Curated annotation (Swiss-Prot):
<dbReference type="GO" id="GO:0006612">
    <property type="term" value="P:protein targeting to membrane"/>
</dbReference>
<dbReference type="GO" id="GO:0051082">
    <property type="term" value="F:unfolded protein binding"/>
</dbReference>
<dbReference type="InterPro" id="IPR016641">
    <property type="entry name" value="EGD2/NACA0like"/>
</dbReference>
<dbReference type="GO" id="GO:0051083">
    <property type="term" value="P:'de novo' cotranslational protein folding"/>
</dbReference>
<dbReference type="InterPro" id="IPR002715">
    <property type="entry name" value="Nas_poly-pep-assoc_cplx_dom"/>
</dbReference>
<dbReference type="GO" id="GO:0005737">
    <property type="term" value="C:cytoplasm"/>
</dbReference>
<keyword id="KW-0597">Phosphoprotein</keyword>
<dbReference type="GO" id="GO:0005854">
    <property type="term" value="C:nascent polypeptide-associated complex"/>
</dbReference>
<feature type="domain" description="NAC-A/B">
    <location>
        <begin position="21"/>
        <end position="85"/>
    </location>
</feature>
<keyword id="KW-0813">Transport</keyword>
<dbReference type="Pfam" id="PF01849">
    <property type="entry name" value="NAC"/>
</dbReference>
<keyword id="KW-0539">Nucleus</keyword>
<dbReference type="InterPro" id="IPR038187">
    <property type="entry name" value="NAC_A/B_dom_sf"/>
</dbReference>
<keyword id="KW-0653">Protein transport</keyword>
<dbReference type="GO" id="GO:0015031">
    <property type="term" value="P:protein transport"/>
</dbReference>
<feature type="region of interest" description="Disordered">
    <location>
        <begin position="89"/>
        <end position="117"/>
    </location>
</feature>
<feature type="domain" description="UBA">
    <location>
        <begin position="134"/>
        <end position="171"/>
    </location>
</feature>
Amino acid sequence: MSVESQPVEKISELPAGSTTVVHAEKAQKLIQKLGLKRVEGITRVAMRRPKNILLIINEPIVYKSSNNAYIVLGKVTVEDMAAQARAFNESQKQATETKEEAAITEESGDAQPADTAKIEESFEQEKAVDETGVDAKDIELVMAQANVSRAKAVTALKENNSDVVNAIMSLTM
């Protein structure tokens, strides 16, 4: 007599109120016939995949075979850790930008004439930087990677003999 021809009985191990299909119940009967033992006390299973993707099963039904292999049943949810990290970094970046903007507006309201003179001097210094001997593409790259002004990028490139990597490292470290 095959499993399919047997009347399907509700298995007591299924959570009450779950909407399982007949095939899942039959699969659980077959699992029990294979001699697998149910493992109690597991509330969450996480499986790591390449590229920081996690497969998460909450409230799983877990069986253990005689050769220490585990069979996990339950609803799988996919979590992309890389996307979550990018979203977290963006939110942190926005938070720091708003804090910086608030600090700038606070400072600009209380700015004294001496402060404005210093700001004007720094703008004049940035305009007066000599870019001879430095490639424009290298300057743009250093500006983008180190998030600095053009004058600082040119200065760093000149100090590091037009070595882009060392210029970026000197500006960011």
